Amino acid sequence: RFEDETQVSNRKKVIILGGGPNRIGQGIEFDYCCVHSSFSLKELGIESIMVNCNPETVSTDYDISDRLYFEPLDSESVLAICQAENINNRLLGVIVQLGGQTPLKLSEKLVESGIKILGTSFKSIDLCEDRDRFAKLMKDLKILQPKSDIVFNFSEAKKAIKSIEFPIVIRPSYVLGGRAMRIINNFEELNNYFNSNFIINNKSILIDEFLVGAKEIDVDAISDGKDIFISGILEHIEEAGVHSGDSACSLPPQTLSAKIIDEIKRITKLISRTLNIVGFINIQYAIKDDKVYVIEVNPRASRTVPFVSKANGIPLAKIASRILTGVKLSKYNLKYKTNKRYAVKEAVFPFNKFPDSDLILGPEMKSTGEVMGFDEDFGMAIAKSQIAASN
């Protein structure tokens, strides 16, 4: 038997799963959410237990949580921690929605082992990850989506193109930061993609219709299962096809009509209620020909949460953490508001350190940071963001 120096307390406690190692697509934005969640739990008198394995993050500082487990974010390590901390049956549950995609993938093993997930259920998380079932749900709700298909080889992809047509967006399933995602315009490019080292045997490949010239929109919201607060509707400055982590965006949106904004709010609330979301939800939309398409739904905090929090002056991660412990949204009297000042987020790229890298932006994420510009004039807000990003 291994030695265990853990001194388990009798206090009510919650385990927060962090984002793990920094990499393109999963960085410090998620750590921001974890840190503010820990502070929020402490204020409620709940013991906060952080599980993370990145010494460069703030969440692993000694004074952020009541207890820190510096362990890898895999099912074996996390389940062992849950077992150790729940000896007195005082563990309220585990928060998986603040650390990006990594902790979200552990939710199935946690549920199978009888560990409670705080917030959105695994059933809803799994539904969002399952492309076929999610597409069926969108069809049932009469919500538009780009045409899509799931294939396993080049032969199946050729058949799928008959109904989807070029150009398409293609990517392996279960990837982060748009890794190995490409925009394909013809059969030659499609064949080259399947002959590349992106393809892993027996793993599914996702094909989506590429909406040429569409505007991309990011929406962050919080729900308690009944009430929904839409904290921000962000309009991307680059057109759809550039990864959301690489695209500059504006809050409030610049070119969307009141009709489109109302439709985005309606769909966001409909999806949140249907999935019984508790905590964060992020939805990515595409707008083309005055039609609203749902690209993706993430039942977790997104990388834009810190930006929206600072732009609106609302501590979203703190509020969401309290929702996860049973507090109702009505307590905060939150309402969607349009700021008099403009906030513009701009991505920071490492091209000066990697001069041979491809400078053209696409669906695979390349940025390693972000900045924001604030001003009452939209043009000045953009200018400030460009100066901050050293562009």
Which positions does each model-derived feature cover?
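Glycine-rich phosphate-binding loop
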Residues: 98
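Hydrophobic/aromatic ligand-binding patch that stacks against planar heteroaromatic rings
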Residues: 40, 109, 137, 160, ...
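Short Gly/Thr/Asp-enriched flexible loops that form oxyanion-binding sites at enzyme active sites
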Residues: 101-114
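N-terminal Rossmann-like NAD(P) cofactor-binding module of classical short-chain dehydrogenase/reductase
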Residues: 95
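A short helix-to-beta-strand connector/capping loop
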Residues: 65, 113, 143-146
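ATP-dependent carboxylate activation and anion-phosphoryl transfer catalytic cores
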Residues: 1-12, 17-24, 31-92, 101-104, ...
